[in-house]
Amino acid sequence: MPNAEARRTTPGPLEVVEIERGFLREVGSVFWFIMNTLQESMERVQQGRAPFRAASFFRESVRAGVDSVPLVGLVCFFLGLTMALLTGYQLQRFGTERLIPGLVAIAFTRELGPLITGIMVAARIGAAFTAELGTMQVNEEVEAVEAMGIGPLRFLAAPRMLALFLLAPCLSTVSNLAAVFASSLVCKVYFSIAFPYFLDLVKDSLLIRDIITGILKSFMFGLLIASIACYRGLTVKGGAAGVGTNTTSSVVTAITAVIGFDTVYNVIYTNFYPT
């Protein structure tokens, strides 16, 4: 009986193929959503007119960027404390606690800062975008926008996508600074590393390409999260239940996309810059 249950629960070749097709279909849908939004916006620009209202862009920028600073800063501050403490005690056993500042700075600037920020933004802002646009879709407000001759992609999706695309690196910078500041406190209190010496160690360890890597990741994470959230919101079906389903799917998909893109980027990066 257990073997029979195992055979029933193990996905067959056809099920695996369907999963792969569904994955590729989702990737293609989001890609074309980005392309169509860009095309619709550029057509408006070529006509000499703004693709969306400036007020909409600034409103979304405040919500996605400024309002997210306390959350991002606080979470990464605690992570910086934890990382400095755990790595510090291990390094102290070998007399290499001076490596703590560089370790934390590189880890957050190149990897943890953009990644943690992307996950938090996907959970907070991505869910809000999907729920908001999904409610508009259910209430037929999107159809009303189309009936007035206004493209919903450039009017509703473009300002959200641009705001998160531009603000994600700023939030990542906040997370990096919060983590490094937290680690400086740990180094001062527990390992007797003065702040000026701490800064010297950070500057000696951190490279320009580490900073550029983190910024590029943040740009892509912001674009992915906003695109997935807006796409899920504008394709809601089934009333209020559909809004909830698509909101959950948006968060899960965005977080998975962020981690997946980060993994692919790191594999490519290490092949070109192995040291």
Question: What are the residue ranges of the model-derived segments?
Answer:
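Active-site cofactor/substrate anionic-group-binding motifs, chiefly glycine-
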Residues: E60-I116
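Selective transmembrane-helix segments that form parts of the transport pathway or gating/packing helices
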Residues: G65, V69, G73, L112, ...
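Hydrophobic positions within alpha-helical transmembrane segments of bacterial inner-membrane proteins
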Residues: F77, L81, I119, A123, ...
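Membrane-interfacial helix-loop-helix connectors in multipass membrane proteins
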Residues: L85-T109, N176-F219, L223, S227-S249, ...
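Hydrophobic alpha-helical transmembrane segments of multi-pass membrane transport proteins
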Residues: I100-N139, E143, I228
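Short cytoplasmic-facing helical segments at TM-TM junctions of multi-pass membrane proteins
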Residues: E132-M161, A240-V243
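Final/C-terminal transmembrane alpha-helix of multipass membrane proteins
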Residues: V243, S250-V267
